[in-house]
Amino acid sequence: MGECWNAGTATFMILGDICTRSCKFCATKTGKPLPADKSEPEKIAQSVKHLYLKHVVITSVDRDDLPDGGAAIWAETVRKVKELNPGITIETLVPDFGGNAFQLQQVIESAPDIISHNLETVSRLTPQVRSAAQYDRSLEVLRQIAASGLRAKSGIMVGLGETEAEVLATMDDLRKVNCNIFTIGQYLQPTPAHLPVVEYVHPDQFEKYRVAGFEKGFKHVESKPLVRSSYHAEKHV
């Protein structure tokens, strides 16, 4: 946290704290969310201003209950943050919007510096790990982001039972859709109700993945046990 703060970076989660999905790796509350707060974009923008941030990461819960998946508030939040904070750089870590390209396009048109969407795990493990998500649909999200000319970013966790070959294949899949920023971190079990850790991956293996990522053409690769999606986010702009 101190490292992020010293870099003038912080992460905000919008659209509430209750998710409509129940991924087996995530500690976010699940259930029926409260109505969306239409004043949230202004509140986030003011918070960024008061904290004198240089770079902000915005993420959200999944809002499959909303007709637009929360896309309008997503886009307005980006616009408001830029309006009140000239010179700020913004990364958005978005859900898949159920595969709705129009909803994703609203976020794209708000023009953040980076749009991130995490695969979270390899293709084989996706049904076990990610509630309602689809590996190929996530790749299509990233393809649409990259095709717009914005920087596309994704990340996975390891230690869930994947193989080295599957991790390398995932990198290849991401490069095929022109994703050029990639993060890898160790999965840690949030509670006994979540998926158990299958393996604590050795730091040497993380370094091997980092080198492989650059060899495959990623412009930025963060690969260490404690790396999370927003780690060193300000350096990816």
Feature map (PLM): residue ranges:
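Core AdoMet radical
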Residues: 11, 27-43, 50-101, 107-141, ...
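Glycine/Thr-rich phosphate-binding loops of Rossmann-like dinucleotide-binding domains
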Residues: 22, 66, 125, 192, ...
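Auxiliary Fe-S-binding modules of radical SAM enzymes
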Residues: 1-8, 42, 46, 52, ...
